[in-house]
Amino acid sequence: MRKGRHYRYGYKKHVLTDGQGLVESIITTPANCADTVVLPELIEKAELTQGISVLADKGYCSKKNSACLLERGLIDGVMLKAQKGMKLTERQRELNNAISKMRCFIEPTFGSIRRWFSGGRCRYRGLERTHTQNILEAMAYNLKRMPGLLVLQSIK
């Protein structure tokens, strides 16, 4: 949203991508909504099969989300967050480092949507319209990436 000359962040876009970076599901929430609340709904929308790793940043770290992933038979790859007054152990830091190395497959999705479709700003007012914009950007991104991925698969 725009107020005067400054833009205010009013919505969050939660995206679940596959291993190749294609968008599988997307949820738009108000900016004041915590990330931890959204992960179970995001996974449910994507209809993930058992045994798949779910990688996420520290904003999605909670005991409830870990239990949800375990219950569905998914591998928990959510980065661990330090508790108040406690530091992460060496093993936990190594785990976070291993997870962060996998972000190179996920982050280009967000950068490409932002670069190709001006995806950094809301064009509309209201949650439903912003969600529609996010869905259209994700569909356009998937369509733009698909021919290149099909060519790569035919070469292999």
What is each PLM-predicted segment?
Residues 58, 80-81, 108:
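Short secondary-structure boundary segments
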Residues 31, 80-84:
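Short, acidic/turn-prone active-site loops that include or flank metal/cofactor-
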Residues 1-58, 63-71, 136, 140:
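Polybasic low-complexity intrinsically disordered regions
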Residues 63-64, 86-88, 120-122:
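Short active-site-adjacent structural elements
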Residues 73, 94-156:
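Basic, amphipathic alpha-helical segments enriched in Lys/Arg and hydrophobic/aromatic residues
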Residues 50-54, 77-78, 148-152:
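Acidic/polar loop patches that form or flank catalytic/metal-binding clefts of enzymes
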Residues 37, 85-92:
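Short, charged, surface-exposed secondary-structure boundary motifs
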Residues 72-80:
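Short hydrophobic/aromatic-enriched beta-strand-loop microsegments
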